Amino acid sequence: MPKVKKVFIGSGIRHDLVLKDQTYGLQYLKEIIRHHISGQLKVAPEHSEDHILALMGKPPIKSFVEFFRCFQKINRQMGKKQFLTCYFIAAYPGCTRQDMERLNRFNRRVLKFKPRQIQIFTPSPSTPATLMYYTGKAYDSGKSIFVEKDKRNKEKQKNLILKGLSG
């Protein structure tokens, strides 16, 4: 396109797929960092606890941690000051208050910042997550899981991240 000078990523990328691609993943990340981020890149680790990530069909948190460290390292090497905006979900089926407390500690210890993008899980039609929400069972094993259905407690889960452990 002749009049387009730059293209920036506005909605984010799948961090889990970047480093999984051992042929082009690192090259792709460097290209994005060098030319296609306007200061912040959105990513969705969604949680820190592996058992919640498994219910979401996502890889273990070590995958995100590796991406996060790689992102920071490449930015340092390129002399750039760019940041990740992380999106998390509270009250996902299987998620307890204790899981959110662990997520809060993960954010302080690993990310070293308090994320602002926290959404309370909302059931949507025809998804494994909604099936788990209504049945209280893991979609893959049929085992019983905790599901927070009280609106106040869902807000408390969210506020654990937004306000810290006192929330």
Where are these regions (language model features)?
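Non-catalytic positions within long, well-ordered alpha-helices that form the structural scaffold/packing
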Residues: 33, 108-109
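Flexible glycine/acidic-rich beta-alpha junction loops that bind and position SAM and/or redox cofactors
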Residues: 17-20, 46-58, 79-98, 111-148, ...
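Conserved SAM/AdoMet-binding glycine-rich loop
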Residues: 1-85, 90-93
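Acidic, glycine-enriched active-site microenvironments
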Residues: 167
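Short, glycine/acidic-rich beta->alpha junctions
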Residues: 24, 98-101
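N-terminal intrinsically disordered, low-complexity, charge/repeat-rich segments that act as generic
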Residues: 101-102, 106, 114
